[in-house]
Swiss-Prot record:
Disulfide-bonded cysteines: none
GO MF term (any one): peptidase activity
Function per UniProt: Probably a dedicated protease for substrate gasdermin bGSDM; cleaves the bGSDM precursor, releasing the pore-forming moiety, which integrates into the membrane and triggers cell death. Involved in defense against bacteriophages. Expression of bGSDM and this neighboring protease is not toxic in E.coli.
Enzyme superclass (EC): hydrolase
Keywords annotated in UniProt: Antiviral defense, Hydrolase, Protease
Name the record gives this protein: Probable protease Gilli_2517
Length: 565
């Protein structure tokens, strides 16, 4: 089993006036330059035994950084839970890479014999990969004479790098804002075995068929949480006999691992650069060499990030998960930031940066309820609690912010949208074909909102804000959904009276799927929800559909914006 911990380190000192005491050559301008020592205290540039990958020539050399992070008796700290003989770590590496500008990373690799033990000492008890990840994430190492667990080592390594790359007489002037660490990511590769169990909350991202009918490589995404530290994990499952495969097959695996690590590093670097500009940690003058350097990096990297594939590895299906960030940026902040970075003129690049920030941003969701007096009671509390419960258990639980507004009047609706700025809007209320959506007035009496009025409010809102989804959980609301289809990505309404039990099943299943990595596949969320209604066959007393031509699971209707048709 091979586990890689990647710690991005972004050095902004090249684009900060004054130099800040940085050594003349602590960076890595050319991988061929391996004669000089690299960063004092980190190590020296060496050749890789495997020569890197055909597609990543810059990986042919690395900085051996054993002096930066140290372990004690590492070989005896292998995984032991649920097996008769503890695993041992028989190989490890600690490496620093740098692109010669401001992008760096420390990668720690651990290779154990757990798979060999499982094969030689068979048993019936399953071994959770989540337990293996927790074990190795909690290994202790020494950085700058301090003990630290691996999943918390990033800031220490960043501090160590900054210190070792600064002139001694300038150590007292070190500014931690100029060298920052990005979020940790982990890549775990294992051979398929019935006892090794992929985490229940992981989800499949890609399946790569190997040449010559040699099986397939499967890729899963997973969020590992420890003490409030969420870590993005890539789990790669390879065929059981993969070790005996040809060099071409192994190159595919290496390229996949490198691509995952590079996407993460590029995303973290862009995030740190944007935040540094936003909070004025760095100030770039138009047409300056520093502004041009940042502009060039943004332009090149944003193009690479949004390609459909890179080095023959498809990355389209990976990006939703890859571009998520635990320390999110606010998309509104990016819009105001864009107004201030006038030295960035490339609209295509700015559009890509906007998409990247959108992927990293927390998605605001607003739950709007209205239940005028003399209407049948709607149990909003049940629907909302189910929604929150599903979010807490979900993979993407940290990427949605849910707000609820009860007893909303017709006059308040517009102002509530402006206040919360939702990307996902859920309306739960009664409605009729003749009158429209049943909002309340100030006396809690019914005050309907027509299709025309609803359209005008949504049209106005989307001139300033993005709406990905409007879900109208109300009877006979198809016309309202249809009227706003050009102002949001997707709208969901109903084409008949929608019984409450069926509505609860739909909502529960739709959001469970959405929160588990499918925010860009709302059609998939919708189809799963209507299937759940059909399979559950909910009982209800308010209507008898036996003599109707329409079936209950056919009542919810998904309407697409024309750009998706």
């Amino acid at each position: 089993m091979h586990i890689i911990f990647q710690y991005p380190i972004v050095d902004l000192r090249d684009i900060v006036s004054g130099g800040n005491g940085r050594l003349n050559d602590p960076k890595w301008p050319d991988p061929q330059e391996r004669r000089q020592s690299f960063v004092s205290g980190f190590g020296k540039v060496k050749s890789r035994n495997l020569g890197g990958s055909d597609n990543f020539t810059g990986e042919s050399y690395y900085c051996d950084s054993h002096s930066a992070i140290k372990f004690k008796e590492l070989q005896h700290q292998g995984f032991s839970e649920g097996i008769t003989t503890p695993a041992s770590i028989f190989n490890s590496y600690r490496r620093y890479y740098n692109d010669g500008r401001f992008v760096g990373k420390v990668e720690i690799g651990l290779i154990d014999n757990l798979e060999k033990i499982i094969r030689n000492y068979p048993g019936s008890e399953g071994i959770q990969i989540s337990s293996i990840l927790k074990h190795y994430s909690n290994l202790e190492a020494t950085v700058e004479d301090e003990q630290v667990k691996l999943y918390k080592a990033g800031p220490r390594l960043s501090k160590k790098y900054q210190r070792e790359s600064t002139l001694r007489e300038k150590h007292f002037q070190i500014n931690p804002d100029y060298v920052q660490t990005g979020e940790l990511t982990i890549v775990l590769t294992y051979s398929s075995h019935e006892r090794l169990i992929v985490p229940r909350r992981s989800f499949s991202l890609e399946k790569i068929e190997l040449p010559n009918d040699a099986g397939s490589i499967e890729l899963f995404g997973y969020k590992l949480k420890q003490d409030g530290y969420p870590t993005k994990v890539w789990i790669i499952k390879i065929p059981a006999n993969f070790r005996s495969k040809s060099g071409k097959h192994k190159t595919i695996l290496r390229d996949l691992r490198m691509n995952l690590l590079r996407i993460h590093l590029e995303k973290e670097t862009i995030k740190i650069l944007l935040n540094a500009i936003k909070y004025k940690q760095i100030e770039l003058e138009k047409e300056s060499a520093e502004a041009k350097q940042v502009n060039a990096y943004f332009e090149q990297t944003s193009k690479k990030l949004f390609r459909k594939s890179r080095y023959d590895i498809k990355q389209e299906n990976l990006l939703d998960f890859a571009l998520q960030s635990e320390k999110s940026m606010d998309k509104g902040s990016f819009n105001s930031l864009k107004e201030n970075i006038t030295y960035f003129q490339d609209e295509f690049m700015l559009d890509n940066l906007g998409k990247l920030v959108g992927s990293m941003a927390v998605k605001p969701m607003l739950f709007v309820c209205s239940n005028p007096r003399d209407s049948n009671f709607i149990d909003f509390d049940k629907e909302y609690k189910d929604l929150k419960y599903n979010l807490q258990r979900a993979i993407d639980r940290d990427h949605y912010d849910i707000e609820i507004e009860l007893s909303v009047t017709k006059d308040e609706f517009k102002d509530i949208l402006d206040r919360y700025k939702p990307q996902f809007l859920h309306l739960s209320m009664h409605a009729t074909v003749k009158d429209g959506l049943h909002f309340e007035d100030k006396n809690k009496a019914i005050l309907p909102m027509s299709v025309k009025e609803f359209k005008q409010i949504i049209e106005r809102y989307t001139k300033k804000h993005e709406l990905k989804l409007v879900l109208i959980s109300a009877c006979n609301s198809k016309n309202h959904a249809k009227a706003i289809k050009e102002y949001c990505d997707f709208a969901i309404g109903t084409k008949a009276v929608f019984p409450v039990p069926a509505a609860l099943i739909y909502s529960n299943n739709f959001y469970t799927t959405l929160f588990n990595g499918y925010q860009k596949d709302l059609e998939y969320c919708h189809s799963g929800a209507i299937n759940a209604i059909e399979f559950n066959n909910p009982k209800f007393d308010d209507l008898d559909y036996k003599n109707k031509k329409i079936r209950v699971h056919e009542i919810p209707v998904l309407i697409k914006n024309s750009k998706y048709v």
